[in-house]
């Protein structure tokens, strides 16, 4: 129950209840009536709780029908309606499923929904970590650069979930700036639900996840360059200039970054950046 003596407060009391379960009753201020609107509630649920384990149901009013006397016409009654329960959220999260149970087209469809992109990603990396820390990451490499990639004021980062509850967009603390083209999610089981961007900047768990995710992206790109060189060439043409920023910023991963660099060469007699440092040394 709301505590009438404290604005925004509440009270808890024990009552005799015929049915099992807990009821939470919210009292809204007059100027906040929009939160009673069906579309507003559904929007909040799908944004923040679309992937939690339990289904969230809302009543959906459907107009009732009646048959007019001496007529075969079915009419919709304007005065009465029947309420049915409808599940609003998905109650599943793609990244929580075992990789062997996820189809390639499912990964691609999730990326398009996540990144608002019509093209399939070049590659992705899906990992679940258990041990001192427990978290799941699903990271994508886009096929092309967005038009505002060089806008340094635009916030970029991963979507952060904690125990499948959406916390924030553009959590930039989980990857360095030179990997700002990466799209994806990180879902932690250890971070507090009330975490803020300020706390993310000074959190040892976040630093550890950032280090692991950075290395994972660079290793995925290394594997892509080795196994699918034509795909890596496509990546380099889109994001190579940004990846070069890492050479000056990230000394810890300098060796990995050096292997990913590509340059032009008079040996090939064209202006394309396709030659690695290893290629130069091998000649």
Question: Where does each model-flagged region fall?
Answer:
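Conserved GHKL (Bergerat-fold) ATPase module
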Residues: 1-283
């Amino acid at each position: 129950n709301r505590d009438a003596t404290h604005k925004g407060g509440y009270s808890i009391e024990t009552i005799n209840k015929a049915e099992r379960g807990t009821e939470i009753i919210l009292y809204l201020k007059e100027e906040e009536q929009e939160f009673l609107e069906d579309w507003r509630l559904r929007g909040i649920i799908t944004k923040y709780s679309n992937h939690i384990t339990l289904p969230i149901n809302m009543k959906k009013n459907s107009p009732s029908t009646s048959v007019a006397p001496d007529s075969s016409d079915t009419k919709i009654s304007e005065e009465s309606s029947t309420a049915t329960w409808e599940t609003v959220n998905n109650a599943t999260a793609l990244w929580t499923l075992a990789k062997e149970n996820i189809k390639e087209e499912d990964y691609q469809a999730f990326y398009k929904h996540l990144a608002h992109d019509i093209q399939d990603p070049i590659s992705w990396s899906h990992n679940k970590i258990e041990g001192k820390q427990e978290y799941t990451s699903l990271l994508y490499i886009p096929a092309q650069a967005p038009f505002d990639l060089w806008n340094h004021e635009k916030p970029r980062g991963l979507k952060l979930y904690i125990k499948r509850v959406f916390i924030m967009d553009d959590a930039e603390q989980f990857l360095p700036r030179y990997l700002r083209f990466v799209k994806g999610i990180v879902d932690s089981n250890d971070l507090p639900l009330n975490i803020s961007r300020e706390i993310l900047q000074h959190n040892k768990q976040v630093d550890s996840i950032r280090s692991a995710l950075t290395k994972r992206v660079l290793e995925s790109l290394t594997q892509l360059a080795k196994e699918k060189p034509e795909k890596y060439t496509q990546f380099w043409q889109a994001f190579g200039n940004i990846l070069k920023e890492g050479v000056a910023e990230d000394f810890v991963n300098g060796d990995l970054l050096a292997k990913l660099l590509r340059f032009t060469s008079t040996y090939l007699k064209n202006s394309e950046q396709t030659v690695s440092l290893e290629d130069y040394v091998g000649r």
